[in-house]
Regions:
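Cofactor-binding active-site loop characterized by glycine-rich and histidine/acidic residues
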Residues: 1-89
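Conserved thiamine diphosphate
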Residues: 19, 55-64, 104, 108-156
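A short, conserved beta-to-alpha structural element at the edge of catalytic cores
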Residues: 29-34, 85-115
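Secondary-structure transition/capping motifs at alpha-helix termini
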Residues: 52-60, 84-94, 125-130, 152-168
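Residue-level marker for buried hydrophobic side chains located in beta-strands
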Residues: 64-67, 96, 174
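Acidic, glycine-rich active-site loops and adjacent beta-strand->loop/helix elements
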Residues: 68-75, 98-104, 137-140
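Terminal amphipathic helices with adjacent charged low-complexity linkers/tails
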Residues: 171-177
Length: 177
C-alpha cells in the first residue's frame, strides 16, 4: 500500500522472517533484496559491499537513497571515504540512511549501544560526513530527514559552484534510531 500504511509496513517488515499459513513470506519486504523489492538492485553479498558502490550509482539528474544497516557499517569501511571522491559533476546525489537497530544478522552490533553510536558519528564527521540522527520508528521523520539531507547537499554544491566551498563536500548521512 501507499502512504502511511505502506511506509509503516516497510519499517515493520524490515527484519520480519515470519512465514504465512500458505508457506509464503509474511513480510515480503524484508531486509534482503528479493523479487518483492521494487527498485532493489543490489544486496551486497557480504555485509557492507553495497556501501562501497552506492555513491556513484545515481547518474546526474538521478537521486538515490541507500538504506544501510549498522551491522554492515561495522564490516566494510571503504565507504567511509565517499565524501573524498563524490563529485556532483559526474554523479547524482546519494543519501545514505543507516538503520541503527543494533543487529547484524544473528548478532548485536557495537552501534547498538549509545557509546558505539556516538563513536560512529564522530568517525563519520572525521571522514567528511554530516550525520543527522532521527527517530527511525516515525515514517514522517524519514521523509523530513531525506528532505533535509537533499537541501543540505544542494546548498553545499551551490556553495562549491560559487567558490565558497571546495571538494570534498560534507555528505549528509541519516541515522535512523
Amino acid at each position: 500500500g501507499n502512504g502511511e500504511e505502506g511506509i509503516n509496513r516497510l519499517l515493520n517488515d524490515f527484519y520480519g522472517y515470519e512465514i504465512a499459513a500458505d508457506g509464503s513470506m509474511a513480510a515480503p519486504l524484508g531486509s534482503h533484496v528479493n523479487p518483492h523489492t521494487a527498485g532493489g538492485i543490489i544486496e551486497g553479498g557480504y555485509l557492507g559491499f553495497a556501501e562501497l558502490q552506492y555513491a556513484h550509482m545515481p547518474l546526474p539528474g538521478e537521486k538515490l537513497v541507500a538504506f544501510l544497516s549498522d551491522g554492515a557499517a561495522e564490516e566494510q569501511r571503504g565507504s567511509d571515504w565517499i565524501p573524498r571522491w563524490w563529485r556532483a559533476e559526474d554523479s547524482g546525489p546519494a543519501f545514505p540512511i543507516m538503520i541503527a537497530n543494533g543487529r547484524r544478522i544473528e548478532q548485536r552490533t557495537q552501534m547498538g549501544t549509545p557509546e558505539g553510536l556516538a563513536s560512529f558519528e564522530r568517525h563519520l564527521r572525521g571522514c567528511g560526513f554530516d550525520p543527522i540522527e532521527f527517530d527511525g520508528r516515525d515514517p514522517a521523520a524519514f521523509v523530513c530527514t531525506l528532505w533535509e539531507m537533499e537541501q543540505r547537499l544542494e546548498r553545499r554544491v551551490q556553495e562549491k559552484n560559487n567558490g565558497i566551498l571546495s571538494y570534498p563536500l560534507p555528505i549528509p548521512y541519516g541515522i535512523a534510531q
